[in-house]
């Protein structure tokens, strides 16, 4: 029983789900709520609806993780045989059932939030996320970059959807908000999420070259080679570092020394370390360590939202 529960928790990739929940809740309370308070209006997702929105995102992501592993069993037996869960701890039929249940609950929860808060089209966007994750699992992840870009966009959507759910009803009603501030921070964090997710997805493809090539996948590293994949990742890391440097210089103008120090130590320096490791890594173990480092940079990026409470 305990083995089954532990296997299920690993199958849905609980750390990634915590990231999603944390991102959406923090963004609500550090960006959206202050902007609404400034305008003298109650947030659309007040009364606990932000937690339901985050839960719906978590459910959809969990369902997507399950269906991804379902279609990847043979590949995972080559790339990471010790981490295969479906068919070893959880029957394939149960995996499909859990995917359907979790995804359906995520969509229905989105519809419920839409009906109660008038967050228009939220149910439809949740359904679109489920469909994209399914198509990714059966087709897109085996093709060069298309699957990587889909996951990067969905990662960015975890930020965008909060602003979408909070503001689309206000636009429909013609209400006035300090929307420029919300928009600026929304695209800042969504862009940060997109770049890091894209980098991580390509690094994971570099890690999984052996199993992917054996089963006919045409990922970027397989099609163009590891060196081309390194250059692709390096370009995005340079973009990321440039943006982080600009952001650090910007906050220093206001004397926000603690924020600048945090950004330098926990975002810029780890990103430089990642860049250096990129051209020294040659095997799956090295690429896995790089993928883990990207996750820590993501977490550090999410936690920068806490500084918004101090400065904005």
What spans do the regions from the language model cover?
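C-terminal membrane-associated helical module and adjoining short loops/tails
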Residues: 1-19, 138, 156-159, 169-312
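Alpha-helical transmembrane segments and their lipid-water interface positions
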Residues: 17-23, 64, 68, 76, ...
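Membrane-embedded alpha-helical segments that form the functional core of polytopic membrane enzymes
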Residues: 21-71, 106-107, 120-134, 178-203
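Multi-pass membrane catalytic core of lipid/isoprenoid biosynthesis enzymes
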Residues: 54-55, 73-126, 216-254
């Amino acid at each position: 029983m305990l083995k089954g529960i532990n296997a299920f928790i690993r199958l849905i990739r609980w750390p990634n789900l915590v990231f999603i929940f944390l991102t959406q809740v923090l963004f609500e309370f550090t960006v959206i709520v202050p902007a609404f308070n400034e305008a003298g209006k109650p947030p659309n997702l007040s009364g606990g609806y932000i937690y339901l929105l985050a839960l719906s995102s978590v459910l959809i992501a969990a369902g997507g993780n399950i269906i991804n592993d379902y279609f990847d069993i043979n590949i995972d037996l080559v790339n990471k045989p010790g981490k295969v869960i479906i068919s070893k701890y959880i029957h394939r039929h149960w995996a499909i059932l859990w995917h359907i249940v979790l995804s359906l609950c995520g969509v229905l929860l989105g519809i419920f939030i839409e009906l109660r808060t008038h967050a228009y089209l939220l149910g439809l966007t949740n359904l679109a996320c489920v469909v994209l994750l399914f198509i990714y699992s059966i087709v897109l992840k085996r093709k060069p970059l298309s699957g990587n870009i889909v996951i990067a966009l969905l990662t960015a959507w975890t930020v965008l959807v909060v602003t979408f759910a909070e503001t689309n009803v206000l636009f429909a009603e013609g209400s006035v908000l300090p929307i420029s501030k919300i928009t600026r921070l929304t695209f800042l964090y969504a862009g940060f999420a997109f770049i890091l997710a894209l980098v991580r997805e390509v690094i994971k493809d570099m890690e999984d070259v052996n199993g992917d090539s054996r089963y006919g996948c045409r990922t970027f590293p397989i099609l163009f080679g590891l060196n081309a994949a390194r250059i692709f990742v390096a370009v995005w890391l340079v973009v990321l570092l440039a943006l982080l440097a600009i952001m650090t210089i910007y906050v220093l103008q206001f004397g926000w020394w603690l924020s600048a120090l945090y950004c330098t130590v926990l975002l810029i320096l780890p990103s430089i370390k990642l860049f250096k490791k990129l051209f020294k890594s040659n095997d799956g173990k090295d690429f896995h360590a790089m993928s883990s480092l990207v996750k820590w940079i993501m977490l550090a990026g999410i936690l920068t939202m806490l500084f918004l409470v101090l400065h904005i």
